[in-house]
Regions:
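Short, non-transmembrane amphipathic alpha-helical segments
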Residues: 105-111, 142-153
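Flexible, glycine-/charge-rich segments associated with ATP-binding catalytic modules
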Residues: 146-180
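Conserved ATP-binding N-box helix of the HATPase_c
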Residues: 12-19, 23, 95-123
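Short, exposed beta-strand/loop patches in secreted or surface proteins that constitute
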Residues: 75, 123-124, 152-156
Length: 180
């Protein structure tokens, strides 16, 4: 399990090492604060690893567990200085793949926008489908995420807000009772 988690979080671990090295070198208080704000990456590593542990132990991940991951990450984004709100509707169980895909998409958006992120709204609805919608105010274009998430939909409005959506089919074996 440890090797699997290390492999899957290798990019974020490398980013964290680079940030810590830069933090040790900087003498600028504003830059140090900015670097410290990037504990978002550390939270992602911790929470994603936890999703894998829970998923392996229980065979599925509850929507509540995913909610806890996103809420903690959202709190860190607020500390970082951006507005952030997470809304998750629905209950039941998700596969490990579904839960990590949701969390990975969230993290990919945050990592892409980290330097310019002003606001992020995350909305997830779990029913027959797992529907993910993110509204992002930041300077970096997110359309490039489609290479990593092929079924991703992206658009940008005239005010520069970006909308990222993805729809995942729920696996029958982990649907909550009464949702079949």
């Amino acid at each position: 399990l440890y090797d699997m988690m290390e492999t899957q979080a290798a990019r974020q671990i490398a980013m964290l090492r680079d940030l810590l090295a830069e933090l040790q070198k900087t003498e600028e208080p504003d830059r140090a604060r900015h670097l410290l704000g990037q504990v978002i990456i550390g939270t992602y590593i911790k929470r994603r690893s936890n999703l894998i542990f829970v998923g392996v132990q229980r065979g599925a991940i509850s929507v509540q567990e995913l909610r806890l991951c996103l809420n903690e990450s959202s709190e860190n984004i607020i500390v970082y200085g951006a507005d952030c709100k997470t809304t998750i509707k629905g209950e039941g169980q998700l596969t490990v793949e579904q839960a990590t895909q949701v969390y990975d998409l969230f993290e990919a958006v945050v990592e892409t926008e980290l330097e310019s992120l002003r606001a992020l709204l995350i909305s997830i609805e779990v029913g027959k489908w797992v529907e993910i919608a993110l509204c992002v105010s930041g300077a970096e274009p997110l359309c490039g995420l489609r290479t990593r998430f092929p079924d991703l939909e992206w658009e940008q409005d005239e005010d520069g807000l970006q909308y990222v959506t993805q729809k995942l089919e729920r696996t029958r074996s982990v649907k909550a009772h009464g949702q079949d």
